Amino acid sequence: KPFLMMYLHKAPHRPWWPNPKKFKEFAKKEFPLPETLFDNYKNRGTAAKTAEMNILKDLRYGHDSKIRPETMEEMFDLEPYVQPYNWGGNDGFTTSYVRFNSEQKTLYDPVIDSINIWFRNNWKGLTNKEKMKWKYQRYMQDYLGCISSVDDNLGRVLDYLDEEDLTENTIVIYTSDQGFYLGEHGWFDKRFIYNESFKTPLIIRWPNKIKSGLKITEMVQNLDYAQTLLDMAGIRQPSDMQGESLVPLL
């Protein structure tokens, strides 16, 4: 029977808690620094300089870097000072960690402990540039650990299509709701329409229709997806829909 399945992952959204296996694996990795990690926002307006997106100034010690509340209390005043906010918890332990069962905590704790020991012994002796590098690595380790799990589970879906002989008769569309800053301009999050955030992943596999390896550079938008699916299914598009089918580009 014909089917349409929407397979949605929350994993890349903050707070970033990879599964225990990925948490341990990625905590050992070191990632290359973006060229603009230490951007000084010269010749740009106030918004770029003051937005709460800076990795050094705005990533939370607990919520994002996995520093335990008791570690922060022991160290007293931490620099840079991170302004409290109202829309979420200030640490990842009162909002996320408390929901883990004892077995899960046992798997997470050795990695969390090693992060906290290093932080306690080294943080106050670091320069701001060194602190920025450390917080960037912690951000990447957890964010990309979550992304890796998404990749694994997308692979399970694609494997199922192969195993059930559905691959050649199934259109697969991989996309997201927006791009994301991974250290470019010293930022995390997504708020500004710079190139890194404005671009959104879009990969389509349509057997016997789309040539493998085809790259399209025309600008499209996510409001085009509904019309594209209708067009693929041979269904007339309602006149009150705003997007345009991408099929002619494919």
For each predicted feature, which ranges?
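Zinc-coordinating Cys/His ligand positions in small cysteine/histidine-rich zinc-finger domains
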Residues: 222, 226
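Short, intrinsically disordered, charge-balanced linker/junction segments flanking boundaries
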Residues: 1, 243-250
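Active-site-proximal cap/lid insertion segments
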Residues: 1, 6-169, 173-219, 232-240
